[in-house]
């Protein structure tokens, strides 16, 4: 008999994925990383900002343990406020995904290994839906609120 997991337990387990994703975003050059970035009625699990000269590149990552369809829907929505949108899940879950669905949506797929390191299974495509005014507003707010400034 399989033990049922409460939504509180799931959120706690999803939070265990935050630090590895923060480390990954730092590794690709993000100089600001904000967990639980508000976007309308949603909370982007991890939002990364890479400032390079006059251009800012932004990343949104939706963390999920199992519900990949929900993660895909959320990550697709986040393409409005970031340049690159990803989902991140434990490796054993990612191995069973049909990546063509994510590729078609332009959403990338990250996996978290049991040792806490992160790999990229599918690179995100630069969003064609990004609204610069959302990105600029979120970036300005993050200058003051970033919990993981590098």
Q: Where in the sequence are the language-model features?
A:
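Catalytic cores of nucleic-acid endonucleases
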Residues: 65-112
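Conserved catalytic cores of phosphodiester-cleaving nucleases, focusing on short active-site segments
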Residues: 21, 46-48, 57-67
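A generic structural motif
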Residues: 49-51, 112
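Non-catalytic C-terminal interaction segments of nucleic acid-processing enzymes
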Residues: 23, 105-150
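Short loop/turn motifs at secondary-structure junctions
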Residues: 56-57, 81
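Conserved beta-strand termini and adjacent loop/short-helix elements that scaffold enzyme active sites
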Residues: 35-36, 63, 112-114
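Acidic-basic catalytic patches of nuclease active cores, encompassing PD-(D/E)XK
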Residues: 1-42, 52
């Amino acid at each position: 008999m399989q033990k049922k997991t409460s939504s509180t337990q799931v959120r706690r387990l999803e939070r265990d994925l935050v630090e590895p994703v923060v480390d990954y975003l730092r590794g690709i050059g993000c100089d600001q990383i904000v967990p639980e970035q508000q976007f309308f009625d949603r909370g982007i699990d991890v939002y990364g900002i890479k400032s390079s000269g006059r251009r800012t590149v932004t990343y949104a990552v939706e963390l999920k343990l199992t519900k990949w369809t929900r993660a895909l829907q959320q990550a697709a929505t986040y393409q409005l406020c970031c340049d690159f949108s990803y989902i991140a899940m434990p490796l054993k879950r990612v191995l069973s995904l049909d990546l063509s669905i994510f590729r078609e949506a332009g959403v990338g797929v990250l996996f978290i290994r049991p040792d806490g390191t992160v790999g990229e299974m599918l690179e995100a495509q630069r969003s064609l839906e990004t609204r610069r005014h959302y990105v600029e507003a979120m970036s300005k707010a993050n200058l003051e609120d970033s919990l993981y400034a590098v």
